[in-house]
């Protein structure tokens, strides 16, 4: 064993005898574990004659390996145990990752290694999976982010691999060809071996235990020396300075930057830069853009990363397309002011980058090499003369069809214009307050309306709160307003001695809405609808569903008919005189069910999509426990039936979900070939036939599923923020201690209980809410 690498009290790195590089993280407070395996090969390494081969192999791997086929393969095995799993194929890497309860980490890792080392590659399964890739390609052909990336690739030098087709589709995957099958196996043999892989493991197990798990599971991964990877081709010079892309949604400006002197963990600096960029405090960039009527928001994204180079995209949402030049000038003026003291300003933002609580997200940060030092020099390449401008507009004169990265775009050239000189602005970079010595506290406030308030009203008030949220964040307080159908909630988490200073002005702002809130709300609502239109049809339906589960409220501009309740943890209750609405006096009960079938349609372009949401028929603990267990049983079967057997599409799922203020079973599907009525028919048939499978469920398997569900429900949250959010979820769902009661009920569930719960589901006792695209 080669123990030459880094040592840390809670982490350790080593190399296994077969050459696999291993990174271990001991997380003693965790109850769940996670694994992340990276293959140092991706789409840019595949043979040019077979575009999509790397992505296709990623899909095929999930169909199982020699030791764990069928329902024992990783994905369905994890789903019934409440785990999560996914994968991602990029240009130079392919990642496979999952999380599960700690006791199942070893068994999950064995399945992961089996499917990567010994994929079955059955030709009939390949044909079925090729249709899944075709459905994924068709869905991505209308996906905003995919099309933006393809348009940015048009600006790169000719021959850069980002301009090649890599997603894969039916026509690019010649399964019947001996040459393709040979290339598939050669690609697997060349790259899926221990010397070309790294594995990260994280869990409550000791470092020695984690290492033993890896040794046992990874012994069968073939050992070979890592191959040398050629340096990536340069991103510069850009093929053009500016381009316009026709895309639904509000007008936007994307500034693309080529970075070519990055170091391994410069993502830390990019995260700090994104935090500073998105600051809504007075005097900052977003505040100035809003005051000048130029822009609404900004998002930073790494489009491509390979060795020392990256393509960075900053997307600004504009109030009007004509504001692009002025906005760009303001951004570079702000950036120039930032550079005067970049090191201290970026370092000051680092404490605001809260450590993620989700196991997979924590492990992802380790994969990225985080936490790491701030290095402002990596931002030196953000210059106007190294910038590719992409204008996004729903209406574009003179557009022509062009293909890039395998996707058809509607683009137009943009004449180079001399940079607009910005008026020098007195930029203010607010510094975070020193850390507080006080304990953390939490405050959750909820208002219940007699119906679903107008979306425009919520958006106007949320925007009015944003400067206050920005100020609170500088003091370590996370504050946000959320719409949950008939309920609105305001949440605050942070040092208990700073909560009152944050909540009091926020409540005053809610009571005294800005005088222009109606007009501003309508503008924001219109922009949100246009923004939503750029997403996948299934995503548009998911965004709309919470607001459709209740009766719309006639427009009001006061709080007189609202009732409120609250949950306070390690903090002081706000003075009731500050609060909008009337105190409920006790905890507001969950909303009552609305039995029967309710059908809504939404005008959505693109493929057919349909959601079926079945809220709980009662708030009884045994009923909810049974429905949660039903969800775990239905999830892999739903995927197998609709995705694998019926070949309906790529985007589909089912599970137990919270939708607005209601909880229940949610089924979702998007299809390029089946109409909404047909999708609903397939879902109904699936649910009707599921009773037969439930009746035949072996007692031993039921016992294992009961225990896995109970263990998840009893899982103790690690951080205070996790404990507070769980307490709030219990408050909304029926009261304190509900998770413990659900765990106890889960352990007592019988097969007859599941059959009874399935019958209640089929009878629509809690309601069947069907939301579909209009076809």
Curated annotation (Swiss-Prot):
Binds 1 zinc ion per subunit. GO terms for biological process: proteolysis; pyrroloquinoline quinone biosynthetic process. GO terms for cellular component: cytoplasm; periplasmic space. InterPro entries: Metalloenz_LuxS/M16 (IPR011249), Pept_M16_N (IPR011765), Pept_M16_Zn_BS (IPR001431), Peptidase_M16 (IPR050626), Peptidase_M16_C (IPR007863), PQQ_synth_PqqF (IPR011844), PqqF-like_C_4 (IPR054734), PqqF_C_3 (IPR054733). SUPFAM superfamilies: LuxS/MPP-like metallohydrolase. GO terms for molecular function: metalloendopeptidase activity; metallopeptidase activity; zinc ion binding. Pathway: Cofactor biosynthesis; pyrroloquinoline quinone biosynthesis. Its EC number is 3.4.24.-. The active site is at 58 (proton acceptor). The keyword Hydrolase applies. Its cofactor is Zn(2+). Keywords: Hydrolase, Metal-binding, Metalloprotease, PQQ biosynthesis, Protease, Zinc. Zn(2+) binds at residues 55, 59, 136. It is an enzyme of class 3 (hydrolase). Gene3D superfamilies: Metalloenzyme, LuxS/M16 peptidase-like (3.30.830.10). Pfam families: Peptidase_M16, Peptidase_M16_C, PqqF-like_C_4, PqqF_C_3. Required for coenzyme pyrroloquinoline quinone (PQQ) biosynthesis. It is thought that this protein is a protease that cleaves peptides bond in a small peptide (gene pqqA), providing the glutamate and tyrosine residues which are necessary for the synthesis of PQQ. Belongs to the peptidase M16 family. NCBIfam families: PQQ_syn_pqqF. This is Coenzyme PQQ synthesis protein F. It comes from Pseudomonas aeruginosa (strain ATCC 15692 / DSM 22644 / CIP 104116 / JCM 14847 / LMG 12228 / 1C / PRS 101 / PAO1).
């Amino acid at each position: 064993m080669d123990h030459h690498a880094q040592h840390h009290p809670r982490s350790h790195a080593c190399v296994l005898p077969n050459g696999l590089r291993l990174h271990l993280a001991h997380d003693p407070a965790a109850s769940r574990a996670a694994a992340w395996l990276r293959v140092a090969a991706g789409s840019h390494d595949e043979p040019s004659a077979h575009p999509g081969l790397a992505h296709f192999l990623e899909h095929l791997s999930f169909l199982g390996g020699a030791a764990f086929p069928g329902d024992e393969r990783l994905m369905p095995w994890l789903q019934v145990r409440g785990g999560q799993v996914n994968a991602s194929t990029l240009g130079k890497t392919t990642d496979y990752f999952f999380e599960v309860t700690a006791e199942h980490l070893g068994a999950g890792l064995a399945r992961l290694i089996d499917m990567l080392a010994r994929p079955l590659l059955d030709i009939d399964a390949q044909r079925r999976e090729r249709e899944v890739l075709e459905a994924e390609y068709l869905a991505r052909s209308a996906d905003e982010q995919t099309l933006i990336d393809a348009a940015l690739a048009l600006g790169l030098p000719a021959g850069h691999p980002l301009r090649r087709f890599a997603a894969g589709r039916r026509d690019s995957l010649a399964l019947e060809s001996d040459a393709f099958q040979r290339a598939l196996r050669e690609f697997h043999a060349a790259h899926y071996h221990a010397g070309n892989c790294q594995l990260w493991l994280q869990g409550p197990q000791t470092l020695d235990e984690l290492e033993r798990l890896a040794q046992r599971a990874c012994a069968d991964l073939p050992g070979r020396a890592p191959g040398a990877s050629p340096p990536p081709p340069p991103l510069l010079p850009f093929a053009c300075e500016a381009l316009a892309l026709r895309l639904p949604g509000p007008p936007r400006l994307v500034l693309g930057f080529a970075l070519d002197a990055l170091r391994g963990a410069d993502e830390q600096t990019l995260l700090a830069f994104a935090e500073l960029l998105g600051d809504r405090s007075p005097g900052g960039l977003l505040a100035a853009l809003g005051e000048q009527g130029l822009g609404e928001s900004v998002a930073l994204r790494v489009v491509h990363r390979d060795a020392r180079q990256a393509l960075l995209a900053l997307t600004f949402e504009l109030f009007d397309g004509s504001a692009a030049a002025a906005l760009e000038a303001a951004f570079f003026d702000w950036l120039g002011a930032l550079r005067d003291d970049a090191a201290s300003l970026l370092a000051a933002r680092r404490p605001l980058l809260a450590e993620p609580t989700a196991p997979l997200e924590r492990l992802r940060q380790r994969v990225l090499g985080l936490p790491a030092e701030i290095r402002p020099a990596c931002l030196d390449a953000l210059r106007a003369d190294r910038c590719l401008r992409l204008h996004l507009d729903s209406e574009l004169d003179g557009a022509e069809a062009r293909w890039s990265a395998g996707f058809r775009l509607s683009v137009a050239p943009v004449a180079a214009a001399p940079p607009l000189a910005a008026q020098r602005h007195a930029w203010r970079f607010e510094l975070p307050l020193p850390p507080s010595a006080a304990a953390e506290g939490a405050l959750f406030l909820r208002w219940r309306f007699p119906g679903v308030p107008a979306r425009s009203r919520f958006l106007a008030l949320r925007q009015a709160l944003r400067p206050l949220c920005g100020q609170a964040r500088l003091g370590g307080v996370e504050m946000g307003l959320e719409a949950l159908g008939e309920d609105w909630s305001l949440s605050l988490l942070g040092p208990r001695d700073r909560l009152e200073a944050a909540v009091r002005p926020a409540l005053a702002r809610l009571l005294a809405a800005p005088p222009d809130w109606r007009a501003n709300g309508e503008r924001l609502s219109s922009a949100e609808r246009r923004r939503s239109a750029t997403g996948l049809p299934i995503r548009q339906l998911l965004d709309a569903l919470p607001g459709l589960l209740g009766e719309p409220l006639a427009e009001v501009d006061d709080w007189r008919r609202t009732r409120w309740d609250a949950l306070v943890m390690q903090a002081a209750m706000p003075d009731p005189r500050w609060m909008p609405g009337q105190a409920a006096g006790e905890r507001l009960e969950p909303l009552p069910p609305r039995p029967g079938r309710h059908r809504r349609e939404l005008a959505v372009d693109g493929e057919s999509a349909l959601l079926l949401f079945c809220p709980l028929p009662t708030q009884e603990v045994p009923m909810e426990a049974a429905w949660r267990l039903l969800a775990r049983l239905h999830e892999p079967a739903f995927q197998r039936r609709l995705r694998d057997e019926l070949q309906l599409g790529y985007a589909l799922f089912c599970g137990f979900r919270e939708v607005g203020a209601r909880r229940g079973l949610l089924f979702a599907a998007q299809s390029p070939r089946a109409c909404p009525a047909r999708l609903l028919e397939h879902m109904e048939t699936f649910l009707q036939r599921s009773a037969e499978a439930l009746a035949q469920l072996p007692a031993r398997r039921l016992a294992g599923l009961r225990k896995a569900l109970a263990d998840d429900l009893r899982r103790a949250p690690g951080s205070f923020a996790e404990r507070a959010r769980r307490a709030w979820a219990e408050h909304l769902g029926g009261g304190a201690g509900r998770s413990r009661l659900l765990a106890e009920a889960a352990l007592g569930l019988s097969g007859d209980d599941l059959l009874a719960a399935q019958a209640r589901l089929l009878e629509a006792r809690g309601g069947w809410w069907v939301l579909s695209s209009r076809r």
